[in-house]
């Protein structure tokens, strides 16, 4: 995900990003966030609820943003930092899977899925 570019922003009852890397290690990653999360831009943090479409308008500017790093923490948090200083932070939800990250890694197309579990924790498939 690091060094990748956001090629798609998806808005429905959740918020999604598709991130592509174009170097020799070409990879594709999709993030889907289903619960409230923090969006930081210009030093200001906003809590966004994907169930309220009007709150997601500022996220459209993430299209073509460069990703500095993205990682999941064992306690169920997901963090994505962008090169321009923006960030997305997702905390675990007590009742629902708060986020899912899926993708493919080279050199052999190897698919994976990470899921932020209800309560705390992360599940890895693949």
For the regions a protein language model found, what residue spans apply to each?
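Surface-exposed, interaction-prone regions used to assemble/regulate multi-protein complexes
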Residues: 1-126
């Amino acid at each position: 995900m690091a060094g990748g570019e956001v090629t798609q922003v998806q808005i429905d009852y959740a918020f999604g990003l598709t991130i592509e890397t174009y170097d020799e290690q070409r990879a594709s990653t999709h993030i889907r966030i289903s619960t409230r999360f923090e969006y930081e831009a210009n030093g200001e943090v906003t809590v966004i609820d994907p169930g309220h479409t009007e709150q997601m308008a500022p996220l459209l500017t993430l299209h073509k943003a460069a990703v500095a790093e993205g990682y999941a923490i064992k306690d169920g948090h997901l963090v994505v930092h962008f090169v321009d200083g923006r960030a997305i932070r997702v905390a675990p939800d007590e009742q629902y899977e708060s986020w899912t990250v899926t993708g493919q890694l080279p050199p052999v197309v190897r698919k994976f899925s990470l899921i932020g579990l209800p309560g705390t924790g992360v599940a890895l498939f693949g």
